[in-house]
Amino acid sequence: MPQLNTTTWLTIITPTLLALFLITQLKLLNSHLHPPTPPKFTKTKPHAKPWELKWTKIYSPHSLPPQY
């Protein structure tokens, strides 16, 4: 049964881990240097709601006597 040749594993795994470490560090550094801009508050016009424009009758359940 042939043996698995692992001599090149160290030369592959080490640069890969180094690259992943550098990428994560750059991402963290970039997020701390440039915080997200705060949202700009604009004045909004209040919208007319349909239930505020017209009067609606409120019905009571049939089991209750009418309330005047």
Curated annotation (Swiss-Prot):
One BP annotation, GO: proton motive force-driven ATP synthesis
For this record, the Gene Ontology CC terms, alphabetical, are: mitochondrial membrane; proton-transporting ATP synthase complex
Q: How does it assemble?
A: F-type ATPases have 2 components, CF(1) - the catalytic core - and CF(0) - the membrane proton channel. Component of an ATP synthase complex composed of ATP5PB, ATP5MC1, ATP5F1E, ATP5PD, ATP5ME, ATP5PF, ATP5MF, MT-ATP6, MT-ATP8, ATP5F1A, ATP5F1B, ATP5F1D, ATP5F1C, ATP5PO, ATP5MG, ATP5MK and ATP5MJ. Interacts with PRICKLE3.
Query: What does the record give under GO molecular function?
Result: proton transmembrane transporter activity
Q: How does it sit in the membrane?
A: Single-pass membrane protein
**Pfam families from the UniProt entry:** ATP-synt_8
Source domain of life is Eukaryota
N6-acetyllysine: modified positions: K54, K57
Q: Where in the cell is it found?
A: Mitochondrion membrane
Alphabetically list the UniProt keywords.
Acetylation, ATP synthesis, CF(0), Hydrogen ion transport, Ion transport, Membrane, Mitochondrion, Transmembrane, Transmembrane helix, Transport
Q: What residues form the membrane-spanning segments?
A: 8-24
Main subcellular localisation: mitochondrion
Identify residues that carry N6-succinyllysine: K54
In which family does this protein belong, per the annotation?
Belongs to the ATPase protein 8 family.
Put simply, this protein is called ATP synthase protein 8
Q: What is the protein's known function?
A: Mitochondrial membrane ATP synthase (F(1)F(0) ATP synthase or Complex V) produces ATP from ADP in the presence of a proton gradient across the membrane which is generated by electron transport complexes of the respiratory chain. F-type ATPases consist of two structural domains, F(1) - containing the extramembraneous catalytic core and F(0) - containing the membrane proton channel, linked together by a central stalk and a peripheral stalk. During catalysis, ATP synthesis in the catalytic domain of F(1) is coupled via a rotary mechanism of the central stalk subunits to proton translocation.
Q: Which gene encodes it?
A: MT-ATP8
